[in-house]
Amino acid sequence: MSDQLFIGIDSGTQGTKGVVFSRDDGRIQAEAYTDHQLIENIGGRREQKPEWWIDACSNVIGQLLNNSNVSRDMICAIGVSGQQHGMVPLDARGDVIRPAKLWCDTETAPQCDQITDHIGSPAKVIELIGNSVAAGFTASKILWLKQNEPQNYERLATVLLPHDYINFWLTGQRK
């Protein structure tokens, strides 16, 4: 068995999966998967608690190490990928303020319209930023937080995407 192994983690909307593979030959040593829950309602809300991702990552990493019969010191790197455009709001201490609004959350559609109207038109938005303002993206989620949960908005210091939050958990760095 290789002296150096990598762990790959993918935290998706429905679950977290992971692999341990050899640096030398790329051979997969072990695989693991854990489901995620989803908070949803008829109004388009789609949220998850970031601690669910951390619990899932811990579980998956534990399964990977157990199933591959390798020691932690053989792991030379962990790579993280995951769902995009979820808004993980953190306060100044790095604590999660509320559940993360996910990429598939459409509850923020009115805020998308407000941002577009403020800029002038859908065409002007595309001219300025190259995209329309979509409910799945982060800007409307921040405005939603300001308008619907002002007490939480006042605490907001950092916004991370889901995979960035997992990297923050692993490294302690908010990047």
What are these regions (language model features)?
Residues 59-175:
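Glycine-rich phosphate-binding/catalytic subdomain of phosphoryl-transfer
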Residues 1-98, 127, 155:
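N-terminal glycine/serine-rich phosphate-binding loop of ATP-dependent small-molecule kinases
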